[in-house]
């Protein structure tokens, strides 16, 4: 008879790095970031979208923050953006998991 072992799942340590989407197309950037959220443990993450224009940055940060909130309700995303206008534009859509830095 084979003895069954007990296994515990441990959280992997959080890596500290900045994720930069490899596309200026906002739909592709959303897919890239959301894929990262789904496939990796990233309760706290940092994303650089400072190369995007204001409207694209608003779209990407809103859609991906929502996806991140669904998986990690207590998580946080730090968005590196090119303008304070992104934060102002998204303030009414905020879920409490986003921080914007210049």
Annotate the PLM regions:
Residues 1-58, 64-102:
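STAS-like cytosolic regulatory interaction modules
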